[in-house]
Amino acid sequence: MNIVALASAYGVGSISIVRLSGDGAYDLAINLCKKPLTPRYAHLRKLYCENMVFLDEAIVIYYKAPFSFTGEDVVEFQTHGGVVVANLIIDELLRLGARVANPGEFSKRAFLNGKMDLVKAESIQSLINARSEGAAKILARTMNGELSVFVNSLRDELIKILAYTETCIDYADDDLPSDILHSSKDLLLNSYKKLEHIINISNSKKGLIDGYKVAIIGRPNVGKSSILNSLLHYERAITSETAGTTRDTIEEQIKFGSHLVRIIDTAGIRDEFDSSIEAAGIEYSKRAAREADIIFCVFDSSQKASLEDRQILEFISNLNKKTIYVLNKSDLEFKFDISLNAVLVSAKLDSTPLSKELESYLNSQDTNDIMLSSNRQIEASRLASEAIKNALELLNESELELFAYELNIALKHIGSITKPMENSELLDKMFSSFCLGK
Protein backbone atom coordinates (compact mmCIF):
# COMPACT_ATOMS: atom_id res chain seq x y z
CA MET A 1 0.00 0.00 0.00
CA ASN A 2 1.26 3.47 -0.92
CA ILE A 3 1.24 5.97 1.93
CA VAL A 4 1.40 9.77 1.86
CA ALA A 5 1.73 12.54 4.44
CA LEU A 6 3.02 16.04 4.98
CA ALA A 7 6.70 15.65 5.99
CA SER A 8 7.31 19.31 6.88
CA ALA A 9 5.80 21.25 9.77
CA TYR A 10 2.11 22.03 9.47
CA GLY A 11 1.49 25.72 8.80
CA VAL A 12 2.66 28.60 6.62
CA GLY A 13 6.29 28.55 5.45
CA SER A 14 8.48 28.97 2.40
CA ILE A 15 8.02 25.34 1.31
CA SER A 16 5.94 22.32 2.25
CA ILE A 17 7.14 18.75 1.67
CA VAL A 18 4.77 15.93 0.79
CA ARG A 19 6.25 12.43 1.16
CA LEU A 20 4.93 9.41 -0.77
CA SER A 21 6.20 5.85 -0.24
CA GLY A 22 5.29 2.43 -1.61
CA ASP A 23 5.75 0.08 -4.53
CA GLY A 24 3.52 2.25 -6.71
CA ALA A 25 4.85 5.64 -5.60
CA TYR A 26 6.59 6.35 -8.91
CA ASP A 27 3.47 5.67 -11.01
CA LEU A 28 1.33 7.85 -8.73
CA ALA A 29 3.86 10.68 -9.01
CA ILE A 30 3.88 10.46 -12.82
CA ASN A 31 0.10 10.94 -12.74
CA LEU A 32 0.73 14.36 -11.21
CA CYS A 33 3.85 15.60 -13.04
CA LYS A 34 3.16 13.91 -16.43
CA LYS A 35 6.90 13.43 -17.17
CA PRO A 36 9.39 10.70 -16.20
CA LEU A 37 11.63 11.15 -13.16
CA THR A 38 15.30 10.19 -12.91
CA PRO A 39 16.20 8.71 -9.52
CA ARG A 40 17.94 11.07 -7.08
CA TYR A 41 17.58 14.16 -9.28
CA ALA A 42 15.72 17.32 -8.33
CA HIS A 43 13.19 17.99 -11.09
CA LEU A 44 11.20 21.20 -11.49
CA ARG A 45 7.76 19.94 -12.49
CA LYS A 46 4.29 21.35 -12.98
CA LEU A 47 1.76 19.27 -11.05
CA TYR A 48 -1.74 18.54 -12.31
CA CYS A 49 -4.75 16.88 -10.78
CA GLU A 50 -7.74 15.28 -12.52
CA ASN A 51 -8.70 16.74 -15.92
CA MET A 52 -5.29 18.49 -16.21
CA VAL A 53 -6.15 21.13 -13.63
CA PHE A 54 -2.89 22.86 -12.65
CA LEU A 55 -2.01 22.59 -8.94
CA ASP A 56 1.49 23.99 -8.43
CA GLU A 57 5.05 24.03 -9.72
CA ALA A 58 7.28 22.01 -7.39
CA ILE A 59 10.64 20.34 -6.94
CA VAL A 60 10.06 16.58 -7.27
CA ILE A 61 12.67 14.02 -6.15
CA TYR A 62 12.36 10.30 -6.80
CA TYR A 63 14.25 7.82 -4.60
CA LYS A 64 14.21 4.38 -6.18
CA ALA A 65 14.09 1.38 -3.83
CA PRO A 66 16.06 0.32 -1.92
CA PHE A 67 18.00 3.60 -1.84
CA SER A 68 15.45 5.60 0.12
CA PHE A 69 14.47 6.40 3.70
CA THR A 70 11.88 3.62 3.85
CA GLY A 71 13.63 1.15 1.54
CA GLU A 72 10.66 1.45 -0.85
CA ASP A 73 10.14 3.75 -3.82
CA VAL A 74 9.78 7.25 -2.34
CA VAL A 75 8.79 10.50 -4.04
CA GLU A 76 8.97 13.87 -2.31
CA PHE A 77 7.16 16.96 -3.58
CA GLN A 78 8.60 20.30 -2.42
CA THR A 79 5.71 22.67 -2.99
CA HIS A 80 5.15 26.33 -2.24
CA GLY A 81 4.52 26.88 1.47
CA GLY A 82 1.18 26.74 3.20
CA VAL A 83 -1.18 23.90 3.91
CA VAL A 84 -3.67 24.43 1.06
CA VAL A 85 -1.43 23.45 -1.87
CA ALA A 86 0.11 20.54 0.05
CA ASN A 87 -3.35 19.26 0.97
CA LEU A 88 -4.49 19.48 -2.66
CA ILE A 89 -1.54 17.29 -3.70
CA ILE A 90 -2.24 14.83 -0.88
CA ASP A 91 -5.93 14.72 -1.85
CA GLU A 92 -5.02 13.91 -5.45
CA LEU A 93 -2.67 11.12 -4.37
CA LEU A 94 -5.43 9.73 -2.14
CA ARG A 95 -7.81 9.80 -5.10
CA LEU A 96 -5.25 7.83 -7.11
CA GLY A 97 -5.14 5.09 -4.46
CA ALA A 98 -2.68 6.07 -1.75
CA ARG A 99 -3.74 6.34 1.87
CA VAL A 100 -2.75 8.73 4.65
CA ALA A 101 0.25 7.42 6.60
CA ASN A 102 -0.14 6.60 10.26
CA PRO A 103 2.12 8.50 12.69
CA GLY A 104 5.64 7.08 12.39
CA GLU A 105 4.71 4.72 9.56
CA PHE A 106 7.54 5.86 7.27
CA SER A 107 10.06 5.11 10.05
CA LYS A 108 8.35 1.82 10.82
CA ARG A 109 8.70 0.75 7.19
CA ALA A 110 12.37 1.82 7.28
CA PHE A 111 12.88 -0.41 10.33
CA LEU A 112 11.02 -3.37 8.83
CA ASN A 113 12.99 -3.02 5.59
CA GLY A 114 16.32 -3.04 7.44
CA LYS A 115 17.16 0.63 6.78
CA MET A 116 17.62 1.39 10.48
CA ASP A 117 17.49 -0.33 13.86
CA LEU A 118 15.21 0.75 16.71
CA VAL A 119 17.97 2.76 18.39
CA LYS A 120 18.36 4.95 15.32
CA ALA A 121 14.59 5.29 14.89
CA GLU A 122 14.15 6.40 18.50
CA SER A 123 17.10 8.78 18.35
CA ILE A 124 15.66 10.49 15.26
CA GLN A 125 12.40 11.14 17.09
CA SER A 126 14.23 12.27 20.24
CA LEU A 127 16.48 14.55 18.18
CA ILE A 128 13.40 16.29 16.78
CA ASN A 129 12.26 16.94 20.38
CA ALA A 130 15.74 17.73 21.79
CA ARG A 131 15.60 20.20 24.69
CA SER A 132 19.22 21.35 24.60
CA GLU A 133 22.31 21.51 22.43
CA GLY A 134 23.90 18.85 24.64
CA ALA A 135 20.97 16.52 24.01
CA ALA A 136 21.14 17.16 20.27
CA LYS A 137 24.84 16.24 20.21
CA ILE A 138 24.27 13.01 22.18
CA LEU A 139 21.33 12.01 20.00
CA ALA A 140 23.22 12.79 16.79
CA ARG A 141 25.96 10.41 17.93
CA THR A 142 23.35 7.79 18.79
CA MET A 143 21.69 8.26 15.40
CA ASN A 144 25.12 7.84 13.81
CA GLY A 145 25.36 4.37 15.33
CA GLU A 146 27.54 4.73 18.46
CA LEU A 147 24.95 3.20 20.81
CA SER A 148 24.19 0.39 18.36
CA VAL A 149 27.92 -0.40 18.15
CA PHE A 150 28.09 -0.54 21.96
CA VAL A 151 25.01 -2.79 22.20
CA ASN A 152 26.18 -5.14 19.45
CA SER A 153 29.65 -5.36 21.01
CA LEU A 154 28.10 -6.24 24.37
CA ARG A 155 25.90 -8.83 22.71
CA ASP A 156 28.92 -10.40 20.99
CA GLU A 157 30.71 -10.65 24.35
CA LEU A 158 27.72 -12.43 25.93
CA ILE A 159 27.49 -14.85 22.99
CA LYS A 160 31.19 -15.62 23.38
CA ILE A 161 30.74 -16.34 27.10
CA LEU A 162 27.68 -18.49 26.39
CA ALA A 163 29.69 -20.49 23.83
CA TYR A 164 32.42 -21.11 26.43
CA THR A 165 29.80 -22.22 28.95
CA GLU A 166 28.00 -24.60 26.62
CA THR A 167 31.37 -26.13 25.70
CA CYS A 168 31.97 -26.81 29.40
CA ILE A 169 28.49 -28.34 29.73
CA ASP A 170 28.75 -30.52 26.61
CA TYR A 171 32.30 -31.71 27.28
CA ALA A 172 32.28 -31.85 31.07
CA ASP A 173 34.17 -35.15 31.12
CA ASP A 174 36.90 -34.01 28.72
CA ASP A 175 40.07 -32.13 29.47
CA LEU A 176 39.34 -28.44 28.94
CA PRO A 177 41.54 -25.42 29.67
CA SER A 178 41.47 -24.88 33.43
CA ASP A 179 40.97 -21.15 33.13
CA ILE A 180 38.00 -21.22 30.74
CA LEU A 181 35.39 -20.48 33.44
CA HIS A 182 37.65 -17.94 35.11
CA SER A 183 38.02 -16.11 31.77
CA SER A 184 34.24 -16.24 31.31
CA LYS A 185 33.71 -14.69 34.72
CA ASP A 186 36.17 -11.86 34.00
CA LEU A 187 34.53 -11.14 30.64
CA LEU A 188 31.05 -11.19 32.15
CA LEU A 189 32.01 -8.95 35.06
CA ASN A 190 33.47 -6.45 32.59
CA SER A 191 30.24 -6.56 30.54
CA TYR A 192 28.19 -6.05 33.70
CA LYS A 193 30.24 -2.98 34.72
CA LYS A 194 29.91 -1.41 31.26
CA LEU A 195 26.15 -1.98 31.24
CA GLU A 196 25.69 -0.61 34.77
CA HIS A 197 27.73 2.47 33.82
CA ILE A 198 25.56 3.35 30.84
CA ILE A 199 22.37 2.72 32.87
CA ASN A 200 23.56 5.00 35.70
CA ILE A 201 24.67 7.73 33.30
CA SER A 202 21.36 7.55 31.42
CA ASN A 203 19.28 7.72 34.61
CA SER A 204 21.27 10.50 36.26
CA LYS A 205 21.36 12.65 33.13
CA LYS A 206 17.92 11.79 31.76
CA GLY A 207 16.97 15.45 31.91
CA LEU A 208 19.44 16.11 29.08
CA ILE A 209 17.22 14.10 26.74
CA ASP A 210 13.74 14.76 28.16
CA GLY A 211 14.38 18.31 29.35
CA TYR A 212 14.98 19.25 32.98
CA LYS A 213 12.03 19.90 35.27
CA VAL A 214 12.59 22.45 38.06
CA ALA A 215 10.13 22.81 40.97
CA ILE A 216 10.04 25.98 43.09
CA ILE A 217 9.27 24.81 46.64
CA GLY A 218 8.80 26.69 49.92
CA ARG A 219 6.30 27.84 52.52
CA PRO A 220 3.74 30.56 51.66
CA ASN A 221 4.94 34.11 51.06
CA VAL A 222 8.64 33.44 50.59
CA GLY A 223 8.41 34.80 47.02
CA LYS A 224 8.16 31.66 44.89
CA SER A 225 5.82 33.25 42.33
CA SER A 226 7.94 36.41 42.28
CA ILE A 227 10.97 34.27 41.43
CA LEU A 228 9.07 32.65 38.55
CA ASN A 229 8.01 36.07 37.25
CA SER A 230 11.56 37.40 37.57
CA LEU A 231 13.02 34.45 35.66
CA LEU A 232 10.40 34.87 32.93
CA HIS A 233 10.80 38.68 32.83
CA TYR A 234 7.02 39.13 32.85
CA GLU A 235 4.13 38.74 35.30
CA ARG A 236 2.98 35.13 34.83
CA ALA A 237 1.91 34.29 38.39
CA ILE A 238 -0.26 36.39 40.70
CA THR A 239 1.67 37.66 43.72
CA SER A 240 0.15 38.90 46.97
CA GLU A 241 1.01 39.48 50.62
CA THR A 242 -1.85 37.11 51.46
CA ALA A 243 -0.59 33.60 52.21
CA GLY A 244 -1.87 30.82 49.98
CA THR A 245 -2.43 32.93 46.84
CA THR A 246 -1.02 30.16 44.62
CA ARG A 247 -3.39 27.19 44.85
CA ASP A 248 -2.26 25.18 41.82
CA THR A 249 1.01 24.52 40.01
CA ILE A 250 2.02 26.90 37.21
CA GLU A 251 4.40 25.57 34.57
CA GLU A 252 6.43 27.55 32.04
CA GLN A 253 9.41 26.92 29.76
CA ILE A 254 12.54 29.05 30.11
CA LYS A 255 15.84 28.83 28.26
CA PHE A 256 19.00 28.91 30.37
CA GLY A 257 22.00 29.05 28.05
CA SER A 258 21.50 26.14 25.64
CA HIS A 259 19.01 24.31 27.88
CA LEU A 260 15.22 24.56 27.65
CA VAL A 261 13.84 23.97 31.15
CA ARG A 262 10.34 23.52 32.57
CA ILE A 263 9.92 25.69 35.68
CA ILE A 264 7.03 24.85 38.02
CA ASP A 265 5.73 27.35 40.56
CA THR A 266 3.93 25.58 43.39
CA ALA A 267 1.56 26.34 46.25
CA GLY A 268 3.21 27.17 49.57
CA ILE A 269 3.64 24.17 51.85
CA ARG A 270 2.31 24.57 55.40
CA ASP A 271 0.59 22.46 58.06
CA GLU A 272 -2.41 24.73 58.60
CA PHE A 273 -4.48 25.62 55.54
CA ASP A 274 -7.70 27.49 54.87
CA SER A 275 -9.54 25.11 52.56
CA SER A 276 -9.57 21.72 50.89
CA ILE A 277 -8.49 23.50 47.69
CA GLU A 278 -5.32 24.77 49.36
CA ALA A 279 -4.72 21.30 50.84
CA ALA A 280 -4.92 19.80 47.35
CA GLY A 281 -2.50 22.46 46.11
CA ILE A 282 -0.01 21.52 48.83
CA GLU A 283 -0.19 17.87 47.78
CA TYR A 284 0.44 18.96 44.17
CA SER A 285 3.50 20.88 45.41
CA LYS A 286 4.93 17.82 47.12
CA ARG A 287 4.27 15.70 44.05
CA ALA A 288 5.98 18.31 41.84
CA ALA A 289 9.03 18.13 44.12
CA ARG A 290 9.12 14.33 43.90
CA GLU A 291 8.87 14.39 40.10
CA ALA A 292 11.35 17.25 39.52
CA ASP A 293 14.95 16.84 38.41
CA ILE A 294 16.00 20.00 40.26
CA ILE A 295 14.43 21.83 43.21
CA PHE A 296 14.61 25.53 44.04
CA CYS A 297 14.07 25.44 47.82
CA VAL A 298 13.11 29.03 48.67
CA PHE A 299 13.28 30.81 52.04
CA ASP A 300 12.64 34.38 53.17
CA SER A 301 16.02 35.77 54.22
CA SER A 302 14.36 38.67 56.07
CA GLN A 303 12.78 36.31 58.63
CA LYS A 304 14.10 33.72 61.05
CA ALA A 305 13.56 30.13 59.93
CA SER A 306 10.11 28.90 60.92
CA LEU A 307 9.05 25.38 61.88
CA GLU A 308 7.58 25.07 58.36
CA ASP A 309 10.95 26.02 56.84
CA ARG A 310 12.65 23.28 58.86
CA GLN A 311 10.01 20.72 57.90
CA ILE A 312 10.40 21.62 54.22
CA LEU A 313 14.19 21.24 54.54
CA GLU A 314 13.70 17.75 55.98
CA PHE A 315 11.18 16.84 53.25
CA ILE A 316 13.50 18.02 50.46
CA SER A 317 16.60 16.34 51.90
CA ASN A 318 14.78 12.99 51.94
CA LEU A 319 14.06 13.25 48.20
CA ASN A 320 17.74 12.99 47.23
CA LYS A 321 17.29 15.55 44.43
CA LYS A 322 19.64 18.20 43.11
CA THR A 323 18.59 21.17 45.27
CA ILE A 324 19.51 24.82 44.88
CA TYR A 325 18.73 26.68 48.10
CA VAL A 326 17.48 30.20 47.51
CA LEU A 327 17.40 32.99 50.11
CA ASN A 328 14.96 35.52 48.66
CA LYS A 329 14.30 39.15 49.67
CA SER A 330 18.01 39.91 50.01
CA ASP A 331 17.18 43.62 49.67
CA LEU A 332 15.77 43.49 53.23
CA GLU A 333 17.58 43.06 56.55
CA PHE A 334 19.05 39.53 56.81
CA LYS A 335 17.59 37.45 59.69
CA PHE A 336 17.56 33.84 58.41
CA ASP A 337 19.27 31.62 60.99
CA ILE A 338 19.95 28.29 59.23
CA SER A 339 23.38 27.88 57.66
CA LEU A 340 22.93 26.91 54.01
CA ASN A 341 25.03 27.05 50.87
CA ALA A 342 22.41 29.21 49.21
CA VAL A 343 21.97 31.73 46.41
CA LEU A 344 21.03 35.20 47.64
CA VAL A 345 18.49 36.96 45.41
CA SER A 346 15.87 39.63 45.46
CA ALA A 347 13.16 38.53 43.05
CA LYS A 348 11.81 42.08 43.19
CA LEU A 349 15.11 43.46 41.87
CA ASP A 350 17.17 40.79 40.09
CA SER A 351 17.20 36.98 39.82
CA THR A 352 20.40 36.83 37.73
CA PRO A 353 22.45 34.99 40.43
CA LEU A 354 19.86 32.20 40.46
CA SER A 355 19.82 31.99 36.65
CA LYS A 356 23.61 31.73 36.58
CA GLU A 357 23.64 29.05 39.29
CA LEU A 358 21.12 26.91 37.40
CA GLU A 359 22.85 27.40 34.05
CA SER A 360 26.19 26.42 35.60
CA TYR A 361 24.69 23.20 36.95
CA LEU A 362 22.98 22.36 33.65
CA ASN A 363 26.23 22.88 31.75
CA SER A 364 28.00 20.55 34.19
CA GLN A 365 25.55 17.80 33.23
CA ASP A 366 26.61 17.80 29.58
CA THR A 367 28.46 14.59 28.82
CA ASN A 368 30.46 12.86 26.12
CA ASP A 369 29.25 9.47 27.31
CA ILE A 370 26.95 7.35 25.17
CA MET A 371 23.44 7.39 26.65
CA LEU A 372 20.29 5.34 26.37
CA SER A 373 17.76 7.73 24.87
CA SER A 374 14.41 6.15 25.80
CA ASN A 375 12.68 4.50 28.75
CA ARG A 376 12.37 1.35 26.64
CA GLN A 377 16.14 1.15 26.17
CA ILE A 378 16.79 1.80 29.87
CA GLU A 379 14.32 -0.90 30.96
CA ALA A 380 15.76 -3.46 28.53
CA SER A 381 19.26 -2.67 29.81
CA ARG A 382 18.12 -2.94 33.43
CA LEU A 383 16.60 -6.38 32.82
CA ALA A 384 19.76 -7.50 31.02
CA SER A 385 21.92 -6.24 33.88
CA GLU A 386 19.74 -8.06 36.40
CA ALA A 387 20.10 -11.32 34.45
CA ILE A 388 23.90 -10.88 34.21
CA LYS A 389 24.08 -10.29 37.97
CA ASN A 390 22.12 -13.51 38.55
CA ALA A 391 24.41 -15.33 36.13
CA LEU A 392 27.54 -14.20 38.00
CA GLU A 393 26.14 -15.55 41.26
CA LEU A 394 25.31 -18.88 39.60
CA LEU A 395 28.78 -19.09 38.07
CA ASN A 396 30.29 -18.76 41.54
CA GLU A 397 28.19 -21.78 42.55
CA SER A 398 29.22 -23.69 39.37
CA GLU A 399 25.55 -24.01 38.31
CA LEU A 400 26.41 -23.93 34.60
CA GLU A 401 22.99 -24.89 33.19
CA LEU A 402 21.25 -22.14 35.20
CA PHE A 403 24.11 -19.77 34.38
CA ALA A 404 23.53 -20.38 30.65
CA TYR A 405 19.78 -19.83 31.15
CA GLU A 406 20.36 -16.38 32.73
CA LEU A 407 22.81 -15.48 29.97
CA ASN A 408 20.16 -16.26 27.37
CA ILE A 409 17.74 -13.96 29.20
CA ALA A 410 20.38 -11.21 29.18
CA LEU A 411 20.97 -11.74 25.46
CA LYS A 412 17.26 -11.46 24.73
CA HIS A 413 16.99 -8.11 26.53
CA ILE A 414 20.22 -6.71 25.04
CA GLY A 415 19.09 -7.74 21.56
CA SER A 416 15.71 -6.07 22.09
CA ILE A 417 17.39 -2.64 22.31
CA THR A 418 18.21 -2.65 18.59
CA LYS A 419 15.75 -5.23 17.28
CA PRO A 420 13.05 -6.76 19.48
CA MET A 421 11.35 -10.06 18.85
CA GLU A 422 8.62 -9.73 16.24
CA ASN A 423 5.85 -7.96 18.12
CA SER A 424 3.62 -5.83 15.93
CA GLU A 425 1.77 -4.36 18.93
CA LEU A 426 5.05 -3.16 20.48
CA LEU A 427 6.21 -1.63 17.20
CA ASP A 428 2.84 0.04 16.57
CA LYS A 429 2.93 1.59 20.05
CA MET A 430 6.50 2.84 19.67
CA PHE A 431 6.21 4.32 16.17
CA SER A 432 2.77 5.87 16.86
CA SER A 433 4.50 8.53 18.98
CA PHE A 434 6.43 9.77 15.92
CA CYS A 435 5.45 12.68 13.69
CA LEU A 436 2.93 11.96 10.94
CA GLY A 437 5.45 12.48 8.11
CA LYS A 438 8.11 10.37 9.84
UniProtKB/Swiss-Prot annotation:
Q: Provide the GO MF annotations for this entry.
A: GTP binding; GTPase activity; metal ion binding
Q: List the SUPFAM superfamilies hit by this protein, alphabetically.
A: P-loop containing nucleoside triphosphate hydrolases
Give the matching InterPro entries. G_TrmE, GTP-bd, GTP-bd_TrmE_N, GTPase_MnmE, MnmE_dom2, MnmE_helical, P-loop_NTPase, Small_GTP-bd
Which residues are noted in the entry as Mg(2+)-binding? S225, T246
Domain (TrmE-type G): residue spans on this chain = 211-363
**One Pfam family matching this protein:** MMR_HSR1
Q: Which residues bind (6S)-5-formyl-5,6,7,8-tetrahydrofolate?
A: R19, E76, K115, K438
Q: What class of enzyme is it?
A: hydrolase
The answer to whether the entry has keyword Cell inner membrane is no
Keyword terms of this UniProt record: Cytoplasm, GTP-binding, Hydrolase, Magnesium, Metal-binding, Nucleotide-binding, Potassium, tRNA processing
Task: Give me the residues that bind GTP, please.
Answer: 221-226, 240-246, 265-268
* Role played: Exhibits a very high intrinsic GTPase hydrolysis rate. Involved in the addition of a carboxymethylaminomethyl (cmnm) group at the wobble position (U34) of certain tRNAs, forming tRNA-cmnm(5)s(2)U34.
Assembly and binders: Homodimer. Heterotetramer of two MnmE and two MnmG subunits.
Task: Name the chain's protein.
Answer: tRNA modification GTPase MnmE
Protein source organism: Campylobacter fetus subsp. fetus (strain 82-40)
Q: Which gene encodes it?
A: mnmE
